[in-house]
């Protein structure tokens, strides 16, 4: 197994997750800001690892496996934390929608890979926009310095949920022929 800079960035993202969770629960006024900062650093590595792997031609099978896993674990844990913090349907509903979509699309990608058609459900531009909206919304909801940032975070969280459903429909449509094939 090769450890290059992109793969190390992905591993760093995974290592940041428990620190992000612990800081989230600390009983200090600075904890939300630092928790959001750790989350943002982890989120930025999600962009950099893929960019550097492509730019430096350092893509590896391990990195291709670990990157989406690290991304989904980071985002799912952040969604669980903000859902717990806010105790409200307007955070829980979009979070549940996005987590369910990730499970559905992960299963679809695995199944399409077994058919040798993984490229038909490759990441699309709408998926990238969705991920950006999720990350920004979650950072704002974790940070929560004032009510306006919280409202903006909740609004963007709903936008991310809509983009999530849109991208899921695109992926299901791309796989429709194989899904409905008898």
UniProtKB/Swiss-Prot annotation:
Q: In the Enzyme Commission scheme, what number(s) does this protein have?
A: 2.7.8.5
Note the topology in the membrane.
Answer: Multi-pass membrane protein
Q: Name one GO cellular component term.
A: plasma membrane
Concerning PROSITE patterns, the annotation shows: CDP_ALCOHOL_P_TRANSF
Q: Which residues lie on this side of the membrane: Periplasmic?
A: 38-60, 108-145
Q: Which residues lie on this side of the membrane: Cytoplasmic?
A: 2-12, 82-86, 169-181
Q: Which reaction does it catalyse?
A: a CDP-1,2-diacyl-sn-glycerol + sn-glycerol 3-phosphate = a 1,2-diacyl-sn-glycero-3-phospho-(1'-sn-glycero-3'-phosphate) + CMP + H(+)
What is this protein's function? Catalyzes the conversion of cytidine diphosphate diacylglycerol (CDP-DG) and glycerol 3-phosphate into phosphatidylglycerol. Essential for the synthesis of anionic phospholipids, thereby playing a role in balancing the ratio of zwitterionic and anionic phospholipids, which is thought to be important for normal membrane function.
Q: Which InterPro entries match?
A: CDP-alcohol_PTase-I, CDP-OH_P_trans, CDP-OH_PTrfase_TM_dom, CDP_ALCOHOL_P_TRANSF_CS, PGP_synthase_bac, Phosphatidylglycerol_P_synth
Superkingdom classification of source:
Bacteria
Assigned protein family: Belongs to the CDP-alcohol phosphatidyltransferase class-I family.
Q: What is this protein called?
A: CDP-diacylglycerol--glycerol-3-phosphate 3-phosphatidyltransferase
